[in-house]
Structures are given as structure tokens and as C-alpha cells.
Amino acid sequence: MIQEKALLELCDVTLFVGAAKLLEQVSLELKHGECLSIVGPNGAGKTTLLRVIVGLLRGYSGSVKIDGTEVRGLSHERLSHLVSLVPQRLEFLPSFSVREFLELSGLEKTEQSLSLVRHLEERCLPQLSAGELQRVLIAGAVAQGAKVLVLDEPTANVDPIGRRDIEEVLRNCREDIGLSYILVTHDISLALRCTDRTALMKAGRLVWSGATRDPALVQQLSVCYGCNFIELKHADLSAPIIVPT
């Protein structure tokens, strides 16, 4: 259930790297139990914003608070209890079973995370498909017990079956566990099915935010990307599809 109290608050976040302005006065909030997608063209600053939120980029002005705590200056260990970044992949795959990997990821929420991967728990990591591995990495982040999960393009480089599996685990996180997460994606259909609100970014700025099912989203996507988008609906689809034309 979404609560009114903000879990994550960004206020006027601006970031320079040298003379380049990567983020400009980004203000955004995520409520307890809410799931947010961040969408925008390449170079919009989406991944940069995620790196600020998880503490990998700290030279920003403005404020970033999680559960009322300013993240600037926090140790990475303390920050890991507040926010967890789900990687797209692991550079090295140890020969652990999925169960062993989740137990090593964190004891706090191990059983909860295992519920997301019940049919995979005895499989070894190197045997998993890209989609199955991404599902396990999401479960690993859940095991760490962070208040906010952050996902950067989780469906990149996966086939349709893997994409379906990732959507399923995101829905479980949202509907069954009640976790809050931020999802950066180019996949508008994924955002429609798996998030409550969508924020659009362009050239380092937040240009629009609103309910993911807001009818204004189609028009705002057209403005953001500079091309026309249309919404397609069908009785067999759980959510409409928005595509460029």
C-alpha cells in the first residue's frame, strides 16, 4: 500500500563534472510502497541520477534524503541499508547455488527473497539465463533489506522469456512484498505494467512526472523524445502499449 509519507526526497539536485552540467535542479519524491519509472532519451541523465541516489556520485548540490536521512556523507555500509542498486549483470559468476548466493547477500530478508525465485533456488548461477540471473540479482537486493531498490535497465539484453520473468519478479516485489523501487528503462510497456508513477528526463532535467496511467503521458513522451507516440489497447493485454510512430 502506498503511503503519503515520502521515502525518498530529491530537492534541486544539480551535478557538474568539470564544466559539464549533468543534472540540473532535479526535484523528485518516492513514497513508501510506491514504484517509480524514470524514462528519457539516451544522455538524459537517468543513470547519473541513479548513481547520485546510491552514493556513487557525491559532488552534487541540493539534497537527497532517504527516510529523512541525507545520504551525502554516509558511509557506503550505512547507505546500503537504505538503498540497493541492482546490477545488470555480475562480472564474475561464482559457482554458488541461488540459495547460497541469497544467503550470502544478506540474512535479513533471505526467506522473503527466496520466495521470488522458488523454482531456481538449487540451480547454480553459471547455469542461469540472462533473465533468470537478473531475477536472482533483484532477489539478492531484496535480501539485503534496503528500503529502496534501484534498477538500471533490468530488461536490457534479455529475450522475451527473460523479460517476462523480470516483470513477474517486479510485480511480486510491488504487490506481494510492498517494496519501493526506482526503475530506469527505455521500455515504456514495462513502466506501464510495473510502476505507479513515471518521471521523464531530458538533458539532465526533470521535464514531467505523473501517474504512469495518466493520459497525458503519451503527449509528454512525444515532447520529450521529439516524435509522436500512440497508445494501443487490446482486451488481451494487462496494460496498454505506448509506441513511437
Predicted feature descriptions by range:
Residues 185-186:
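H-loop/switch region of ABC-family ATPase nucleotide-binding domains
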